[in-house]
Amino acid sequence: MNKGKSMKIRTSIVKASYCSAFIVLLLSGCDSAEKAEQANSGLPSSIEARDAFVADIVAKHIYKAGETLPENPNGYPPYIYGTADLNNNGEDEILILMQNQDYCGSGGCTGFVFDNKKQQVAKFTVMDRPILLGNEVHLGWHDIIAYSDGAMHSLRYSADGYPLNTSTAPIFDYETKQKEAVGLAMNSEYYKDNGTNLVPAYQQKIFDCQSCYLFSYDYQDGSDKISYLEVNVDSKKVTPIEAIK
């Protein structure tokens, strides 16, 4: 073999080795990033894994042994959930709001908060959406702002934990900023040209921001399509929302 040919082969081997090493590092980096994300929140990072994590909590820690989740006649899922770092420890808690008749009454439904080790942190009665992450912190825990029995209430953490009955917690002034949110939505590019019948929609994701409001609206062209806008009053940002659960 001549020297030039030997050099080309050696160069090719080096390039191949470099590429292989780069791919390994890239995959390792992705895996590390995913693990870091899970470590940061303490919960599974993928939606599917997180759904399974919550389903296990419901099956083992909310429902009694042998019970199964019933079908809701209205088509709603038996529960919904959201996550947030309530106590600023770098790990997310999970709020699960039950939606079937076993856990719901005329004023609202039962909600539960669990940590990432599946330990129950709090239980709430007479709770419904919107359920927002409050800005204020008491004893290291964020307030939870939730609807109950015709009004929004501020659930504040105390030496005894969060209060059980949402409806007896202090009233939270939700309407003042909601009026400002209506103006921002109506003046947005998404609504003012072809929108009509703007109304509040309360299917916000659990632990949405305290200053966030959701609206639905129709189109003036007679289309059956219903669209949604989320308004953050503090940032003045209006965002179209594609799907609502």
What is the predicted role of each segment?
Residues 110-129, 164-167:
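Extracellular C-terminal loop/segment signatures of secreted glycoproteins
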Residues 104-109, 223:
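Short, solvent-exposed loop/turn segments at conserved positions within beta-propeller repeat blades
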Residues 66-79, 124-134:
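Repeat-based blade/solenoid architectures
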Residues 88-99, 138-146:
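Acidic/hydrophobic-patterned starts of short beta strands in beta-sheet-rich repeat architectures
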Residues 27-29:
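C-terminal motif of bacterial Sec signal peptides marking the signal peptidase cleavage site
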Residues 31-56, 133-245:
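Acidic, small-residue rich beta-repeat scaffolds with periodic aromatic anchors
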Residues 5-19:
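Bacterial N-terminal signal peptides that target proteins for export
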Residues 82-86:
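Calcium-binding motifs, dominated by EF-hand helix-loop-helix domains
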